[in-house]
């Protein structure tokens, strides 16, 4: 949520920032509602003052034994007028909320201009795209040949965009999850959390999924819960409504994630790249505002370390203003090389939300002057486990169809060096 005081005092500044996203703010409507609010509040204050004065005069008249009938009638009329104005103010504030709750975050000045992913800026590469002395196969062909990926079973059990991992495939997914959690907790200083996989509407509102993205969520039919689309939701909400005594706070969690992919019809229909259910290790940091820029770089480096230890070539891109997520002020994407697709694909988004989520969450700390101030929140995937499995299969495939296990992962697979049929 954007700062209401900024929206009221400098709507043109907000409009200019949102225009970089190619989002048009209706400044005239915003100003009209604010002027209406001010006028109603002034009228209400005057009427309430008059009511208080009338009450004082009625009390004084009664003590003097005077007739107060006319005065009481006038006070009753005043009360009805106050009630009408209060209802008008309530409607005006609701209209303001409806208009402003759908406003995305303002991009940081360092975010490149652009309309969509074609305008994102590549910042750096790690490693070179894998090359082979044979035609590389994609993870679907590799996994099915090894008997470790079963899309037919996933479709039979649930439907399209589901998969079953078997044997070494299931073990590999478990090993990747454990490897990521151990790295982030023992080397990067995160506290591991085991959260619920269901969330209420308040939690999803706090992180920005509701109300705007409800169509992409799986909702329970008879209970007021949603399946979480990412562990960002429970992790960021852990301290909702609190004044945090100590910063920074770093949380990580493994969870399955559930997404309807309502806007992805026809995209990535082959393989495990886009699933309704997928596993992910999530990183969340809660920091002081002056520390959030550096925290963003640090969090991104933590996600990069996973790829480096797994010997997976990748690149880091800065998302342009038009491609930013709704709540983000700045985002880096990590894109891993997939030989089977002959292209880089996103495997992690690392974002700084500044105070956007914290304002919804009423998540604060005490500044040096003792006054509560909003924190800044950040998160990123560290990593998406299914896409990491895909990248590992494709980048470490051998000519005979076996998969080489990178050294960092072998302790989690009982010393296994290859996966083979």
Curated annotation (Swiss-Prot):
Molecular function (Gene Ontology), one example: serine-tRNA ligase activity
Q: Which residues cross the membrane?
A: none
- Sites where the protein binds L-serine: 230-232, 282, 381
* Gene3D superfamilies according to UniProt: Bira Bifunctional Protein, Domain 2, Serine-tRNA synthetase, tRNA binding domain
Q: In which pathway does it act?
A: Aminoacyl-tRNA biosynthesis; selenocysteinyl-tRNA(Sec) biosynthesis; L-seryl-tRNA(Sec) from L-serine and tRNA(Sec): step 1/1
Q: CDD domains annotated for this entry?
A: SerRS_core
Per its UniProt record, what PROSITE patterns does this chain match?
AA_TRNA_LIGASE_II
Q: What does this protein do?
A: Catalyzes the attachment of serine to tRNA(Ser). Is also able to aminoacylate tRNA(Sec) with serine, to form the misacylated tRNA L-seryl-tRNA(Sec), which will be further converted into selenocysteinyl-tRNA(Sec).
Into which family does the record put it?
Answer: Belongs to the class-II aminoacyl-tRNA synthetase family. Type-1 seryl-tRNA synthetase subfamily.
Instruction: State the protein's name.
Output: Serine--tRNA ligase
Species of origin: Acidithiobacillus ferrooxidans (strain ATCC 23270 / DSM 14882 / CIP 104768 / NCIMB 8455)
The protein's gene is named serS
